[in-house]
From Swiss-Prot:
Belongs to the deoxyhypusine synthase family. This is Deoxyhypusine synthase. It catalyses: [eIF5A protein]-L-lysine + spermidine = [eIF5A protein]-deoxyhypusine + propane-1,3-diamine. The gene is DYS1. Disulfide bonds: none annotated. It comes from Eremothecium gossypii (strain ATCC 10895 / CBS 109.51 / FGSC 9923 / NRRL Y-1056) (Yeast). It holds the Pfam family DS. Keywords: Hypusine biosynthesis, NAD, Transferase. The lineage of its organism: Eukaryota, Fungi, Dikarya, Ascomycota, Saccharomycotina. The keyword NAD applies. It comes from the Eukaryota. One of its GO terms (biological process) is spermidine metabolic process.
Length: 382
């Protein structure tokens, strides 16, 4: 070997075989699941997620999401007897200790999908404090009590489906007759709500329309409408039914953006000159007040857009959430709210600097059933 060759090899060794520095003790070794071991057979969901935490990529984020949810559920503060009157707000467990107020947000397509049953489980068992969804998240829950949604294909042609009166949501199909049944069901309820509103106004005077401090008054808000629909449907398969039964508010700031908006629009003609009113401002006061009164606040956001921002902005009123789990497929390069990572919300004061937060980049229907199985439904009581 010539001196020149030795020089070249020396340079290459410096570049290619550069020595690593000391490995920090905090580093975790990447490991997967060894299915040849007996304890990997018929694993519990919680054990599966625990094993996935060291896989890397979104598997690790999934494990982190479960840890954060477990922590927000397990947190306990002072007993109510230790608090002054002003501090006796927020959420408390059955023993009277402060617990996290958990805001659950989900987009309408998730109710259209089979994830509805998972979401209903959380509400049925009082595992969340408040819900934010879109109009479809309200109406599709009711519609599924009236008629089924079917599996289809992503590739089905829109023109052919239109001829058959079939509406496609991804690879789901909703017959248009379902919406006709929804109209038949909801119109008498809207009529009754309008009659109650007008009777109240006649009794109290028109000035009562500007005041909405009485929770039981028929000056309607989107959350009161959702509660009424849950009461009227009286079906245990419904998310709204259990929200009504357990007094969990369902906020829908975009209540008119869907079939229910169509029903409200048509009702303005049927009921004219009387008009059913929905007070959005009363609802923003209600959700923001819930956030401000929370001892600890957690966000579980399934999807993006309005439902994500509405909860995050409510948490701004308390200088940020203490826990945040985002699950969606959005990317941040387009500046969208859906794509934004939790750290962007930190810059706005919507998540605390010291908060536990993670974003899982995944289809919610793929990973959230696993998360619920490993946390809310793992048999451990929080």
């Amino acid at each position: 070997m010539s001196n020149n060759d030795e020089t070249v090899l020396g340079h290459l060794a410096d570049h290619v075989f550069k020595h690593s520095g000391p490995i920090p003790e905090s580093f975790v070794e990447v490991k997967g699941i060894d299915y040849s071991k007996p304890d990997a057979i018929d694993m519990r969901a919680s054990d599966l997620i625990k094993s996935m935490k060291t896989m890397g990529f979104q598997a690790s984020s999934l494990g982190q999401a479960c840890d954060i949810i477990d922590e927000m559920r397990a947190w306990r503060g002072k007993h109510i007897d230790e608090l002054d009157e002003y501090s006796r707000k927020g959420s408390f467990d059955e023993n009277g200790f402060q617990k996290s107020t958990i805001f659950l947000g989900y987009t309408s397509n998730l109710i259209s999908s089979g994830l509805r049953e998972t979401l209903r489980y959380l509400v049925q068992h009082n595992m969340v404090s408040a819900i934010v969804t879109t109009a479809g998240g309200v109406e599709e829950d009711i519609i599924k009590c009236l008629a089924p949604t079917y599996l289809g294909e992503f590739t089905l042609k829109g023109a052919a489906l239109r001829d058959k009166g079939m509406n496609r949501i991804g690879n789901l199909l909703v017959p248009n007759n379902n919406y006709c049944k929804f109209e038949e069901w909801i119109v008498p309820i809207l009529d009754a709500m309008l009659a109650e509103q007008e009777a109240y106004v006649a009794q109290q005077g028109k000035d009562c329309l500007g005041v909405n401090t009485d929770v039981d008054s028929p000056i309607w808000t989107p959350s009161k409408l959702c509660d009424r629909l849950g009461k009227e449907i009286n079906d245990e398969s419904s998310v709204l039914y259990w929200a009504h039964k357990n007094k969990i508010p369902v906020f829908c700031p975009a209540i008119t953006d869907g079939s229910i908006g169509d029903m409200l629009f048509l009702h303005t003609f049927r009921a004219s000159p009387q008009q059913l009113r929905l007070d959005l401002v009363a609802d923003i006061r209600k959700i923001n007040s819930m956030s401000m009164e929370a001892s600890q606040a957690g966000m579980i956001i399934l999807g993006g857009g309005l439902i994500k921002h509405h909860i995050a902005n409510a948490c701004l009123m308390r200088n940020g959430a203490d826990y945040a789990v985002y699950i969606n497929t959005g990317q941040e390069f387009d500046g969208s709210d859906a794509g934004a990572r939790p750290d962007e919300a930190v810059s706005w004061g919507k998540i605390k600097v010291e908060a536990k937060s993670v974003k899982v980049y995944a289809d919610v229907t793929t990973v959230f059933p696993l998360i619920v199985a490993a946390t809310f439904a793992n048999g451990k009581k929080n």
